[in-house]
Amino acid sequence: MRDETPEQPAPLRFGYTTGSCATATSLAAARLLLAGSADDAVEIVLPKGQRVMMRLEFCRATADGAEAATIKDAGDDPDVTHGALIFARVALASAPGVRFHAGPGVGTVTRAGLTLPVGEPAINPVPRQMMTTHLEALAAEHGYAGGFDVTIGVEGGEALALKTMNPRLGIVGGLSILGTTGIVRPFSCSAYIASIHQGIDVARANGIAHIAACTGNASEDAMRAHYQLPDMALIEMGDFAGAVLKHLRRAPVARLSMCGGFGKLSKLAAGHLDLHSRHSSIDLPLLAQWAAEAGASDALQAAMRAANTSQEALKLAHADGVPLGDLVCAQALRVARDIVPPSVAVEIFAIDRQGRFVGEAR
């Protein structure tokens, strides 16, 4: 779960997805079986055509096939799997085709609404296609007409998965093998955004019409207490308000409650869809302007512009009888309604650092 106000410096280095790691290790293991060569690095082709060389920790024969492993390097992205050992075990099969299995640390889908059927290992479609493409090319190169059984695992993956949204999404037993481009872009947080989308899809597929998108622990607790919503209806959006709102264009629900800290929602109110301080900042003069439109005195406006934090500006406004929390929520509601379909009923709630409601709009 994300804190309400995470701060990180902006990094630069790219990394590779778990899907790329699975592709490299499965290819290396299969090559050992078909060509007899155990490599210490393997080249793979990413979905957009880039060729990359990935270093292996080991590549060795087993009693029933071969296995290879690599260390996941997410670059400078804050990825929960960074530094994890990802491995593939490959066995040859008489039937053609590639069959995927969840090894230790890789989850299994147990709920409808995801891109994979219930009962399938949580190896997403693009990584599956990457592995299939590489293994079929290897088979053709060596004149092999049989198939492959591929088991993907992540060392410690079951524990790491508890730090992700997988348990709430109904992916049990471990992590998902992810990636659409094969590359992890620094602080793109693509896996986190994908899990937001999956959370909405799972809620819809299981008949939930009212979801609550929350920026962190305190806002989620507030929504859970206010509406007695099931966990499946609670979407951990973190700073990615835009990921929620834009996905609802394609996958609408009947009702959206959005809840967050007052400062973060003031950024949404100003039109920012990424609420992290790297990408947006709190606009105290704009808060003062909204207060002025509600009758704030010149003295209050000046004090708000000079405030050290949004919370200080909020306290000043409330002490003077100006409902700044409601004003900010109303502006955030306007931004949200401009994005989601008219069929989605939207409401916005702001909380203070103690988790108390300080504003709302419908």
UniProtKB/Swiss-Prot annotation:
It comes from Burkholderia lata (strain ATCC 17760 / DSM 23089 / LMG 22485 / NCIMB 9086 / R18194 / 383). The keyword Protein biosynthesis does not apply. The lineage of its organism: Bacteria, Pseudomonadati, Pseudomonadota, Betaproteobacteria, Burkholderiales. Keywords: Cobalamin biosynthesis, Methyltransferase, S-adenosyl-L-methionine, Transferase. It catalyses: Co-precorrin-5B + S-adenosyl-L-methionine = Co-precorrin-6A + S-adenosyl-L-homocysteine. This is Cobalt-precorrin-5B C(1)-methyltransferase. PANTHER family: COBALT-PRECORRIN-5B C(1)-METHYLTRANSFERASE (PTHR35863:SF1). Signal peptide: none annotated. Its EC number is 2.1.1.195. InterPro entries: CbiD, CbiD_sf. GO terms for molecular function: cobalt-precorrin-5B C1-methyltransferase activity.
